[in-house]
Each structure stands twice: as structure tokens, then as C-alpha cells.
Amino acid sequence: MRTATLYRYSVPMEAGVILRHQRLKSRDGLLVKLQQGELSGWGEIAPLPEFSQETLDQAQVAAECWLQHWVSGVESDDSVLPSVAFGLSCAQAELKQTLPLSADYRKAPLCTGDPDELFAVLQALPGEKVAKVKVGLYEAVRDGMIVNVLLEALPDLTLRLDANRSWSRAKADGFAKYVNPALRSRIAFLEEPCKTRAESREFAQDTGIAIAWDESVREADFQVEAEPGVAAIVIKPTLVGSLARCQQLVQQAHQAGLVAVISSSIESSLGLTQLARLAAWLTPATVPGLDTLDLMQAQVVRPWPDSPLPLITTEQLGVVWHR
């Protein structure tokens, strides 16, 4: 006997969470629960506005269609919508007990804004000091100066930077100009600095600052391959698709000598704990990019270890579909 339930959640965000062009006031998504006999499995379906190709309403329609088949005993292919494919594959993997329970709760702290705040966060980090800084929100020159100050002040720090394709080549060069060439090797990678892949490649080769592919990974013509100046690919499962697709990308990256980083698309605590398990399984040597829970005002169903945020339970969620 199979049953399935689809819940919808809405969690208020902290003030000041800005995506590409809009403020994100709440994080909205779906949780799916599959049940078969004594076993159950959960997954999260949460398209990220401005980044996902699908809307939440479109994802809900696709999920309901897939679940209708599943409860009838029909095994459907993965959804073509990445967030749906990811959430449903997680629920199936939990049900079949194929998603390992051990998790990598390390996170590269996400630093924005005040450099003084960054110092405090980074100096409190135990072990390997890896942090992520969003660049491209302010002036490129200012970003370069902040990165340089951080690397100078903390000699054991490695930074991951993310520009979200926000710079022209000239602005990217303006950033690099303010980062001491002797410190550039401690930039693990800069995600997609320029508006085109060609410009980003040239930037990496001209400046010695390694880059990573992020948005490119989700584009139809993208191939994982070793290239001069490219250090990593960033895999955001909500934007990429099923667990099998994520596994394929990680294997391709490792075969090409690239680092693969499992990264958050601002999922709820339930989705984040599953990403931590995925990271421990597929990329155990790499700190995942999962430091997004503190952008929210609550956790959902499953808590992240040691988080002080209140937990929303299943009883507090709206059921949008059940069979």
C-alpha cells in the first residue's frame, strides 16, 4: 500500500535577503512524504525565484501528477523540472534507504556586508578556514579591496567568491587589480565572474584567479571538462535535478580533476540536512556550501544540528495533496 502527501510551507526571511533583482521576503516550497508499508521518505521541492526555470505552482502540478502515478504503482521517469526531480528522488532514496544517513554539517560561512563582521565569523572557525563572499552586489573595486583585506588579515583563510555573472570584463579586471597577486592563490575559486563563459575563461587566464562554473552547469550546452583556470563546478541540486544527475556531475568533475561543491539554493532545514548527507556521500573531501539557514526565521520538520531557530512541524503545514 502506497500513500503520498504534499505539504506547502512558507518561512519568513530575514530582512535584506536579495536575489538577483528582488528582495526575498519568504521562502516558499513543498515537502513530499512517500509512505510504503512501514517505510517513509521525505523530499523538498522549492524552486528558487529568479534562478529556477520553473515556478512553485508549476512544480506543484508536476509533483501531483508524478505522485498520482506513484500511488497507483506506476514508476514514472524523473520530472523534467529540476526542483521536482530533486525532491522526489530524495524521497524515493529515503524510502529505499539508499541516501546515506551520515552528513557533512561543515559549512563555508556566507559572509556579506561589513568586513569587521567577517573577521569575527572567520576567526571563530575551527579547522580549515573556508568562507564564501558574495561579490558583484557593490562596486567591483570595493569587492577587491575587501577580499584583499580579508586574505591579508587571515593568513590561513581560503575564500570562495560568487559573482553570479554580474561583471563586465572591465569590472572584473577592476576587482582583480585590488587583489594582491601574491594572495590570489588563496581564492579557491570565483564563481562565474563575467557575463559570458568566454570572458570568464580569459579573466582566469589573465589574472591567475581560478574560476568555477555555477550557472553554466545548468545550461544545455555545458560539458564538464578540464580547462586552464577552471578549478571547480558548483552543483545546486534544486536547480540541477535528481540525485542521479548530481552523482553524474560529481563523477564527471572528479574525472576531469575538478572540485565539485554541493551547494544550497536556500532550501529549508529539511532540504539542507539532505544536502549535507549528499555532500558526505559524494564529496566527502570538500566543504559544502550550505550556510543559508540563518537567512530564514524558522526551520521546517527536520532541524539542522545546534540551530536555535524554531521548528515548524508537519501539523503546522498545509496539506495540498494526499492519496
Swiss-Prot record:
Transmembrane segments: none
Cofactor(s) listed in the protein's UniProt record: a divalent metal cation
This enzyme's EC code(s): 4.2.1.113
Pathway: Quinol/quinone metabolism; 1,4-dihydroxy-2-naphthoate biosynthesis; 1,4-dihydroxy-2-naphthoate from chorismate: step 4/7; Quinol/quinone metabolism; menaquinone biosynthesis
Catalysed reactions, as listed in the record: (1R,6R)-6-hydroxy-2-succinyl-cyclohexa-2,4-diene-1-carboxylate = 2-succinylbenzoate + H2O
SUPFAM superfamilies, A to Z: Enolase C-terminal domain-like, Enolase N-terminal domain-like
Family under the similarity heading: Belongs to the mandelate racemase/muconate lactonizing enzyme family. MenC type 1 subfamily.
Protein's job: Converts 2-succinyl-6-hydroxy-2,4-cyclohexadiene-1-carboxylate (SHCHC) to 2-succinylbenzoate (OSB).
Protein name, as recorded: o-succinylbenzoate synthase
Natural source organism: Yersinia pseudotuberculosis serotype IB (strain PB1/+)
